[in-house]
Amino acid sequence: MSWQAYVDDHLMCDIEGHEDHRLTAAAIVGHDGSVWAQSATFPQFKPEEMNGIMTDFNEPGHLAPTGLHLGGTKYMVIQGEAGAVIRGKKGSGGITIKKTGQALVFGIYEEPVTPGQCNMVVERLGDYLVEQGM
């Protein structure tokens, strides 16, 4: 399966039990910041934004004072899982990022999608990739 198929079929899909509820944007990005696959709506990000995200995975709490920035959008960092998941909130939407051995799985959402639904979609694919050694 191509990386693009993972984004299209497992991240940008209808959320279980809620037709027409899906993430706003999603991507799989290597730890080096190279995009493996992304939705058409995923924001163009700056290298320093990706560096900040990677630093937060290695030093949990790094982004808390400044917020998480992606594509020029600032998210308030909320409770995640140290070294494994970063979650952010902005207005009625937010972001979930799951770290795997080689990649970061991104999901961005707006209402009516809930934070829990975004977490489920992103973390399910991330956990699968971890199990596959990715």
From Swiss-Prot:
Phosphorylated by MAP kinases. The modification Phosphothreonine is found at residue 114. Pfam families: Profilin (PF00235). SMART domains: PROF. One of its GO terms (cellular component) is cytoskeleton. GO terms for molecular function: actin monomer binding. Binds to actin and affects the structure of the cytoskeleton. At high concentrations, profilin prevents the polymerization of actin, whereas it enhances it at low concentrations. By binding to PIP2, it inhibits the formation of IP3 and DG. This is Profilin-1. It comes from Olea europaea (Common olive). The lineage of its organism: Eukaryota, Viridiplantae, Streptophyta, Embryophyta, Tracheophyta.
